[in-house]
Amino acid sequence: MDKVVPEGLWPWYAKHPEENALFNAAMVGKAHGQVAAVTAAYDFSPFGTIGDIGGGRGHLLQAVLKATPGATGVLFDQPHVIAESAGLASKRLTLQSGDFFKDALPACDAYLVMEVIHDWNDQESIAILRAIRKAAPRHAKLLLIEELIPDDPGPHWSKTLDILMLSLLGGAQRTRQEYAALFKAAGFSLVRVVDTGGISILEAVPV
């Protein structure tokens, strides 16, 4: 991929709005079933403010807010992605653009991070998680939503996805233990894993 897109896939999308819009639309379509499973499996009602970090067009955050009438949300993504989502802004949903490697993230009671960390290598993933940890109040929860590689050595879709993420972005799908190690390096502790029937919610807290 480096030979095809030397500057990296995400900077390339930032310069190609039509392709970026197509990609974001595809992500919304792909995640439809996953989002429904997440909102059915997890109780978001304890949270007042919910941040969606790298949340694209906000499909997950919108569904969570619909299921949690008392909550407000902050959608954080790159400027060109947030520009596509301008119509989502409301009294309950705030838009914030930036770079999670450089810019301050919002202070929230819970942080949704859905299929973001698998885009990055371990060092980059820890940097993203540390940025969240820096912004997170002591009582906050991190809700990382990813396809886990199971301990079973047999065939599994996540292993195919692992190869795809490595070839496209230098990223990785990971096991529960590997995510726990990333959390520890970033100042979080894994509390539990909620299986939604496919994708998993890894709940972590600041330490």
Which residues does each predicted region cover?
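Alpha-helical subdomain
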Residues: 39-40, 44-207
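Conserved Class I S-adenosyl-L-methionine-dependent methyltransferase catalytic core
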Residues: 1-49
